[in-house]
Curated annotation (Swiss-Prot):
N(1)-(5-phospho-beta-D-ribosyl)glycinamide binds at E22, L23, E82, D286, K356, R363, R364. Pathway: Purine metabolism; IMP biosynthesis via de novo pathway; N(2)-formyl-N(1)-(5-phospho-D-ribosyl)glycinamide from N(1)-(5-phospho-D-ribosyl)glycinamide (formate route): step 1/1. Coiled coil: none annotated. It comes from Pseudomonas putida (strain ATCC 47054 / DSM 6125 / CFBP 8728 / NCIMB 11950 / KT2440). Its EC number is 6.3.1.21. PANTHER family: FORMATE-DEPENDENT PHOSPHORIBOSYLGLYCINAMIDE FORMYLTRANSFERASE (PTHR43055:SF1). This is Formate-dependent phosphoribosylglycinamide formyltransferase. ATP binds at R114, K155, S160, S161, G162, K163, G164, Q165, E195, G196, F197, I198, E203. GO terms for molecular function: ATP binding; magnesium ion binding; phosphoribosylglycinamide formyltransferase 2 activity; phosphoribosylglycinamide formyltransferase activity. Residues 119-308 form the ATP-grasp domain.
Length: 393
C-alpha cells in the first residue's frame, strides 16, 4: 500500500531527481501534484526541473563521491535518473545499501552506454537488431565499416540526443565521421558502435510502463529526426497489426530484462511487418512530449504513478496529436519568446517553454503541441505553431 507524507515534514516522501532537463521538469510537476517532496540535482544551476522542485543541488553527476554525498545527506526514498551521464557504479552501490533506484541501478547502468543495452538485446535476448561492431581505435573502426559496408551509421557508445552520430556513405566520410563521434561522446573520446544501415520505413518510440498491475503499452509514437535529434513526433503512428504486436513483444522482453517500475522509451525501426530493436531509455522520452496533449495521463504522470506504486487502470487517448520543437540557434542568457498569441491561435494547441537558463548554439527551448482529426493535420498544426514563435536573444 502506497502512503505519501507531507512535503517538508518528517513524514515526507522524498524523490531525488538526477538530471533536470525539460523531461525531468514535467516529472517533478507530476510528483508535486501527488504531494511528493522533490530534490533536483544537475551539473548547472537553474536547470528547468530545479525551477519547480522543493530544492536543488549543483553537482557533477559523473563524480561518484559528490553524488553519493548529496544522496546520503538527502536520504531520498527514490532516486530517479533523468539522463545517462551519471556515475552508475555509485547508483549500484547505493542500491545494494538499501536505496531505491528507478527503475533499477542495473537498468541505468546498462542503458547509459549503447554497448550494454545492445549486447543485452541482441546477444542475451536474441532480439532483432541491425548488424554491429564496437571499436576503440580508428583502425578497428575502419575495419568495422569495411565489414558492414556502406551505408552505415557510427555513434559514440555514450551520448544522447544524436550527439556524435552520423551516416557514412563512402570512404570520403570515414575520417570526419570518426572525428565527429569522438567529439560527441558524453565522456569525451572513446569507444564507438558501427551499425549496418537498416532500410526501414519509419521509426517509433513505444512508450512502455511497468507498474504494479503489469505492463501497459501506449499508442506508438512516430517521429522525425535530424542529425539524430528529434524535430517532431506524433501519436498514433499507423502500423500493421503484426508490426504492432512484434513491437510490443520486443518492448516487453527488453523492459522485463531491465526490471523495476517506471516508464521506458523503447525505440524501434519498422518496415512492413518487420521490427528491429534500436535503443531504450529507462525514463520518459523526448518524443513522448506529444503525450502532454494526446492522453489523459502523460508519460510523465504515468512515470510518477509507476514509481510510487500507484495503479494505472487505463490510459485514454484523445485522438491524433503531434509535437514540434522550438529549436532556435543563438547565444543568450536572457532568451525571450514572442508572438505566442499567434502560435496559440488555433484550437487544440499548447506550448511548453522549458525555461532553460542559456543557449549557446542550437538548443531545444520549447515544444508546440496540437490535436486534430488526423495525424497529418495535427503535425501541420504543431509545425505552424512552432514556426510562429519568435525567439529573441
Amino acid at each position: 500500500m502506497t502512503r505519501i507524507g507531507t512535503p517538508l515534514s518528517p513524514t515526507a516522501t522524498r524523490v531525488l531527481l538526477c538530471g533536470c532537463g525539460e523531461l525531468g521538469k514535467e516529472v517533478v510537476i507530476e510528483l508535486q501534484r501527488l504531494g511528493v517532496e522533490v530534490i533536483a540535482v544537475d551539473r548547472y544551476a537553474n536547470a528547468p526541473a530545479m525551477q519547480v522542485a522543493h530544492r536543488s543541488h549543483v553537482v557533477n553527476m559523473l563524480d561518484g563521491v559528490a553524488l553519493r554525498a548529496v544522496i546520503e545527506a538527502e536520504k531520498p526514498h527514490y532516486i530517479v535518473p533523468e539522463i545517462e551521464a551519471i556515475a552508475t557504479a555509485t547508483l549500484v552501490e547505493l542500491e545494494n545499501e538499501g536505496f531505491t533506484v528507478v527503475p533499477t541501478a542495473r537498468a541505468t547502468q546498462l542503458t547509459m552506454n549503447r554497448e550494454g543495452i545492445r549486447r543485452l538485446a541482441a546477444e542475451e535476448l536474441d532480439l532483432p537488431t541491425s548488424p554491429y561492431h564496437f571499436a576503440d581505435t580508428y583502425e578497428d573502426y575502419a575495419k568495422a565499416v569495411a565489414d558492414l559496408g556502406y551505408p552505415c551509421v557510427v555513434k559514440p557508445v555514450m551520448s544522447s540526443s544524436g550527439k556524435g552520430q552520423s551516416l557514412l556513405r563512402s570512404d570520403a566520410d570515414l575520417q570526419k565521421s570518426w572525428d565527429y563521434a569522438q567529439e560527441g561522446g558524453r565522456a569525451g573520446k572513446g569507444r564507438v558502435i558501427v551499425e549496418g544501415f537498416i532500410d526501414f520505413e519509419y521509426e517509433i518510440t513505444l512508450l512502455t510502463v511497468r507498474h504494479v498491475g503489469g505492463t501497459t503499452f501506449l499508442e506508438p509514437v512516430g517521429h522525425r529526426q535530424e542529425k539524430g535529434d528529434y524535430q517532431e513526433s506524433w501519436q498514433p503512428q499507423a502500423m500493421s497489426p503484426k508490426a504492432l504486436a512484434e513491437s510490443q513483444r520486443v518492448a516487453k522482453a527488453v523492459t522485463d530484462a531491465l526490471g523495476g517500475r517506471g516508464l521506458f522509451g523503447v525505440e524501434l525501426f519498422v518496415k512492413g511487418d518487420q521490427v528491429w530493436f534500436s535503443e531504450v531509455s529507462p525514463r520518459p522520452h523526448d518524443t513522448g512530449l506529444v503525450t502532454l496533449i494526446s492522453q489523459d495521463l502523460s508519460q510523465f504522470a504515468l512515470h510518477a504513478r509507476a514509481i510510487l506504486g500507484l495503479p494505472i487502470p487505463v490510459v485514454r487517448q484523445f485522438g491524433p496529436s503531434a509535437s514540434a520543437v522550438i529549436l532556435p540557434e543563438g547565444q543568450s542568457q536572457q532568451t525571450s519568446f514572442a508572438n505566442l498569441g499567434a502560435a496559440l491561435s488555433e484550437p487544440d494547441t499548447a506550448i511548453r517553454l522549458f525555461g532553460k537558463p542559456e543557449i549557446n548554439g542550437t538548443r531545444r527551448m520549447g515544444v508546440c503541441l496540437a490535436r486534430d482529426e488526423s495525424v497529418e493535420l495535427a503535425r501541420a498544426k504543431a509545425t505552424r505553431a512552432s514556426q510562429a514563435v519568435k525567439v529573441e536573444f
